[in-house]
């Protein structure tokens, strides 16, 4: 399971004319699900995302996690993250989980964020979405379990 996390001052996702999720300061989480992923991996990744200390403390050091910084989370499904890009000029998506498994684990990941007390907004699984964000820093990390 892969999370590309970005520290943002604002982020939103829309499907057509509908805004399905919007946050102020916090984390935009692009979430990719691989074939061998399960709830245990989703739990570990959620703990890591929410605990990752990438927000500045009073001294300007990256020392606070999103909860300590008072932020929110916007989770967007991203089936291209597990792509195999090692050869050729076209990505292969054979590493990605089938849609039913991916959606179940995406929904589970979101539920774990909410259960941890995080204000959590989402995109719409498998929809064509437009994501807008203001990356703060920029600060972007690739987390993989």
Curated annotation (Swiss-Prot):
GO BP term, example: D-amino acid catabolic process
Primary subcellular site in the record, as a coarse category: cytoplasm
UniProt motif (Gly-cisPro motif, important for rejection of L-amino acids) ranges: 137-138
Keyword RNA-binding assigned: yes
EC number(s) from the headed UniProt entry: 3.1.1.96
Catalytic activity: glycyl-tRNA(Ala) + H2O = tRNA(Ala) + glycine + H(+); a D-aminoacyl-tRNA + H2O = a tRNA + a D-alpha-amino acid + H(+)
InterPro entries referenced in this protein's UniProt entry, alphabetically: Daa-tRNA_deacyls_DTD (IPR003732), DTD-like_sf (IPR023509)
Origin: domain of life: Bacteria
GO MF annotations, alphabetized: D-tyrosyl-tRNA(Tyr) deacylase activity; Gly-tRNA(Ala) deacylase activity; Ser(Gly)-tRNA(Ala) hydrolase activity; tRNA binding
Cellular compartments annotated: Cytoplasm
tRNA-binding is among the record's keywords: yes
Keyword terms of this UniProt record: Cytoplasm, Hydrolase, RNA-binding, tRNA-binding
HAMAP family found in the cross-reference section: Deacylase_Dtd
Subunit comment: Homodimer.
Known function: An aminoacyl-tRNA editing enzyme that deacylates mischarged D-aminoacyl-tRNAs. Also deacylates mischarged glycyl-tRNA(Ala), protecting cells against glycine mischarging by AlaRS. Acts via tRNA-based rather than protein-based catalysis; rejects L-amino acids rather than detecting D-amino acids in the active site. By recycling D-aminoacyl-tRNA to D-amino acids and free tRNA molecules, this enzyme counteracts the toxicity associated with the formation of D-aminoacyl-tRNA entities in vivo and helps enforce protein L-homochirality.
Free-text domain note: A Gly-cisPro motif from one monomer fits into the active site of the other monomer to allow specific chiral rejection of L-amino acids.
Protein name, per record: D-aminoacyl-tRNA deacylase
Species in which this protein is naturally found: Cronobacter sakazakii (strain ATCC BAA-894)
Taxonomic lineage from the root: Bacteria, Pseudomonadati, Pseudomonadota, Gammaproteobacteria, Enterobacterales
């Amino acid at each position: 399971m892969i999370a590309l996390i970005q520290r943002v001052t604002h982020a939103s996702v829309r499907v057509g004319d509908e805004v399905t999720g919007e946050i102020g300061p916090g984390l935009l989480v692009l979430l990719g699900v691989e074939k061998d992923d399960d709830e245990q991996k989703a739990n570990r990744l959620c703990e890591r995302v929410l605990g990752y200390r990438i927000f500045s403390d009073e001294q300007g050091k990256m020392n606070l996690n999103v909860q300590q910084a008072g932020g929110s989370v916007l989770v967007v499904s991203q089936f291209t993250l597990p792509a195999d890009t090692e050869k050729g000029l076209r990505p292969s998506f054979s590493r990605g989980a089938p849609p039913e498994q991916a959606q179940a684990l995406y929904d589970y990941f979101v539920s774990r964020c909410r259960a941890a007390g995080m204000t959590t907004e989402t995109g719409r699984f498998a929809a064509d979405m437009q994501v807008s964000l203001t990356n703060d820093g920029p600060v972007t990390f690739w987390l993989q379990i």
